[in-house]
Amino acid sequence: MTAQPTPDHLVTDRSLLSTKAYGTGQHLAARQSLYQWQTPSHDLPGIVVNELADVRGAVADVGCGNGKFVARVRKDRPDLVVLPMDVSHGILGAIPGALVADAQQLPITTGALGAVLALHMLYHVEDQAQAVRELGRVLAPGGIAIVSTNSRTDKLELEHLWRQAAGDVLGIQEGPARVQLSARFTMEDAPAILGTVFGEIRTIPLPGVIEVTDAEPVVAHLASYEAWADKMGVPFRETIERARERVNETIQEEGSFRVTCLGGMLVCQ
């Protein structure tokens, strides 16, 4: 069975994103936590802070989620004014100064920022071209945009695991693919999309291998896609449990379960 691309509306539905998917930080935290077992370990907030070394003034984190990057930038660069914003009110929680905002229409004056962050979020934006124009609009001359996403080759082992588990549940050789978030804006596609606004784009590749000896981190990652459970064409909970069994079987046979990762940041000017 050939994997079918995830329909755009499943990944960009603002109502779903602001409630089931990111109404709280629970699911995002589950996806982030899987990287605890990655080698080499990449300090993503630290990389952002390093890239902001020459930036002064205000920095917006568009699609800031649970504020992981906001907290680090505020800690390491107290001289910067950090503006957190996200489409979901719920996930913003108690982040000081956060506001609900749409990346396609940023509530920021033209040329007001020294930098803007758009980290693992442009694949959720319906009109990516408009969002990229907005990123460019709000930057002062010489300002930078830092964007992140995954490669189309990222975590293919998890896609294979899901389809095998789904096939087991359905009684067929291989089940349907799960919702793939970053497929709408991959590392391979990003330079062309960002290049419509930015003249200089530098990619920082972040490869690694996740290796676990306990199924739970992988299961938690898969379960974090619960917001799309009724869109996957397979009983969600049953597939999760079958995936758990398959991961445990691999660990028993091979000593661990491995996932190959490739994400990256793009620094744009």
Label the model's feature ranges.
Residues 185, 191-269:
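Conserved Class I S-adenosyl-L-methionine
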Residues 2-56, 68-69:
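Conserved class I S-adenosyl-L-methionine
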Residues 117:
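A conserved beta-strand element that flanks and buttresses the S-adenosyl-L-methionine
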Residues 56, 113-114:
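Local beta-strand N-terminus motif with an aromatic residue
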Residues 129, 136, 141-212, 229:
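Conserved catalytic/acceptor-binding region of the Class I
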